Amino acid sequence: MRRKIELMKSQRWTAKDSKKHIIVPSELDHKYSRGTLGVITGSAQFPGAAVLTSKAAIATGLGVLRFHSSSGLAHLVLHASPEALVQPGKVDAWLAGSGVSDKKYSDYTTWLRHRWFKLMSAQSVPTVLDAGALDWAGKLTQPTLITPHAGELAKLLVNRGIQVSSESIEADSKKWSMVAAEKLGVTVLLKGSTTYIAKPDFLIELPKATPWLATAGSGDVLAGIIGALVSTNYIEILNDENNLARVAATGAFIHNSAALLASKDSPISATSIIRFIPEAIRKII
């Protein structure tokens, strides 16, 4: 495996590559043909993640967003995005875990969010796992993408019997993204100053991100962008699972592009990134 990783060349992802995976609607489309994303994010500890993931997904462009919650989180999402639906139903893709602790019993709403995660196995559609849902990696039958940072990936691998520290992962992100993809049987987007998207025999490298992206909620925005793209590309992903990596790379490219537009070399917030998602997409297509 070590020799294979050393020889593996990464594909440098560009705007031209991204354009291929942004589905522009035609006059024949309607809301249900443009992708329905099921979202299970946010908790009492991190309620803002529910809003950020939902707003980012809607800003990216999709047909329907279904937010799954039996708590006050639904009211927060509806206040910020009245176009969201807040009842269960058929979905074309899942986004789960952002703003949810991996400590299932830390509080009542977190426990409830983990119960909602079980819906992912009931509808076998392409799935994005973040933060508190990362432990589902390798446990689902559908094409699955995980979006950890180094600390989360280290914890996940240690729990699966692979001893590694977050410092080691940060020192060689390329290697560990590929190790994780092979050992877990999923597509891995490893977040960092340089983001890698890995499958065992397939590696994409994103341009170095603006340092201003190191801000609270930025990862939730990324998850929402990718979730929307997965829902609009779900047929392509089911036909060729490598497209999940390409769609994830497109989401990361849009995320950084929106951050650059929002920043102009000055501080930004997660909310300000969302405002520039449509402009970032317009420049790509």
Task: Outline where the language-model segments fall.
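Non-cysteine beta-strand/loop elements that form the S-adenosyl-L-methionine
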Residues: 144-151
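Small-residue (G/A/S/T)-rich helix-start motifs and N-terminal tracts that mark the onset
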Residues: 1-128, 135-142, 155-285
